[in-house]
């Protein structure tokens, strides 16, 4: 009985299917009244028709070449393609200070307004150390999107955040006397010396440190290291207060130096090997007046360990005195710059100042009067082309090339000073040259900024030793 009942149910279900289909599915002619499928444009022969943006890049994923066919313009194609591929990178307005954004694939480019730079035009050049030294009088340091000023030793930062105020009466780099008030006389301490000065004679002058290249001193074909002011002006008392003079065992001036601190004088390494003994004189503008000068005895001499006599590379040495220099309005140390300040600010100035008691012309007599001359900086390429002698990274050129104004014999070791905001910084040491003031030739100077760590390491030894000695570091 049960099998017959199941069979009847199946048969009844099968009979009802056609009627169910007619109730659920519409006939095609009726269905097309309500449901329509949008067909692609120009289907069938689309390649023979003009490019169509909708067909090429909306309905389908187009290639860059297909987009080029649509726009028929490279610039418009690039503008579309960079957005089409990965979206518009400029939607977030990444360019600051009114910069214009141009989208790229996976990147963007900002075109900055004048006075701004950086990937997002985020750097205000008015707040950059590269523009007018960030308005800093001395040293400038970039800090995030701003600048931070600081000052040389002996100065404090002004309330305005960029000026430098001298803390002491004889802070470094100051010309205390105005030129019109200077007198051609020796400073007071020269005629009435303190007991702190150690007056010495040739019997107690120390022997200087011998160079490791001393055997090369007999060579005569190297550039003139001693020959280094031609056609300079008289340096009035107090105008070159950082000038030091090196005196040999005969009491003759043979080179120059720069006062760095009460105990230290900077000079050229090649000067150290020119005499058996040396002493130092400061505050003097007329070396013929021997009766009024006092010699400062030397405690140690530090010649740079890499100094090469033949090439005059690393031509730098430091003299440490036994007793401190007494500063006055006529005796003031030069300021030491930072390397960045020297390289990017000071040495970008037009002129440096060179002083000394050297020959007043090539092969001429030396000068008893301190001379000073302003010499322009020379770009490195011109400097290198001016001579067959190697110009190393530790050297730079200064001079006119077509005017006979130069350092000359007897000026060696003396200061090359650059003034900035009324402060005078040491930028070079008179080193060597081919003759004096020759046409097409320049004076060569030791680049002090390369040696600041070495200088400061030695100057930390402020206290002189109890016994005279020589040394190398």
Swiss-Prot record:
GO BP of this protein: blood coagulation; induction of blood coagulation in another organism; proteolysis; venom-mediated blood coagulation
UniProt subcellular location: Secreted
Transmembrane parts of this sequence: none
Protein name: Venom prothrombin activator vestarin-D1
Modified residues (4-carboxyglutamate): 46-47, 54, 56, 59-60, 65-66, 69, 72, 75
Family the entry assigns: Belongs to the peptidase S1 family. Snake venom subfamily.
Coiled coil: none
List of glycosylated residues: 92, 273
Lineage: superkingdom: Eukaryota
Keyword set, alphabetical order: Blood coagulation cascade activating toxin, Calcium, Cleavage on pair of basic residues, Disulfide bond, EGF-like domain, Gamma-carboxyglutamic acid, Glycoprotein, Hemostasis impairing toxin, Hydrolase, Protease, Prothrombin activator, Repeat, Secreted, Serine protease, Signal, Toxin
Residues at the catalytic site: 270, 315, 412
MF terms in GO: calcium ion binding; peptidase activator activity; serine-type endopeptidase activity; toxin activity
Residues in Peptidase S1 domain copies: 229-460
The protein's enzyme class: hydrolase
Domain EGF-like, chain residue ranges per copy: 86-122, 129-164
A Gene Ontology cellular-component term: extracellular region
Assembly and interaction partners: Heterodimer of a light chain and a heavy chain; disulfide-linked.
InterPro entries for the chain: Coagulation_fac-like_Gla_dom, EGF-like_Ca-bd_dom, EGF-like_dom, EGF-type_Asp/Asn_hydroxyl_site, EGF_Ca-bd_CS, GLA-like_dom_SF, GLA_domain, Pept_S1A_FX
Post-translational modification summary for this protein: The vitamin K-dependent, enzymatic carboxylation of some glutamate residues allows the modified protein to bind calcium.
Enzyme Commission code: 3.4.21.6
